[in-house]
């Protein structure tokens, strides 16, 4: 179970309009950069973008997750997973869970409901690596 450390590099939250809106759709995207190997760990950049329709507010969070495997076997498995070009689902959930309090606070300050839906997992469920925060 690898250890995860997070670094938030940038937070931007902006409200464009204060008009009353009957229906508000909130879209959230989590995007990951290409993993970098550093000594015995991996560095993976991420960007979380939250936008509203109609456009009345937006939130952007940029950061980095540092994944430190406990064993050489975990390091090898993670390296293979990243070579496939996919981000492990437990890592997506860990990034979302870490940033959810920040997103909730910013949403409250902007006066919009927080996007609390968990990211969807692909239909294939593979046995993988569990992560520890």
Regions found by a protein language model. Name each.
Residues 1-94, 104, 108-133:
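N-terminal intrinsically disordered, cationic/polar leader segments
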């Amino acid at each position: 179970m690898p250890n995860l450390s997070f670094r938030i590099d940038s937070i931007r939250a902006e409200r464009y309009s204060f008009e009353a809106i009957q229906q508000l759709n909130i879209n959230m995207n989590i995007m990951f950069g290409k993993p970098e190997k550093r000594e015995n760990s991996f560095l993976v950049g991420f960007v979380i973008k939250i936008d509203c329709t109609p456009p009345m507010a937006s939130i952007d969070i940029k950061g980095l997750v540092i994944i430190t495997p406990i064993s050489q076997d975990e390091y090898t498995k993670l390296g293979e997973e990243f070579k496939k070009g996919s981000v492990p689902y437990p890592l997506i959930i860990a990034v979302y869970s870490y940033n959810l309090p920040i997103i909730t606070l910013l949403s409250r300050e902007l006066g919009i409901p927080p996007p609390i839906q968990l990211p969807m997992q692909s239909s294939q469920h593979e046995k993988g690596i569990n992560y520890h925060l």
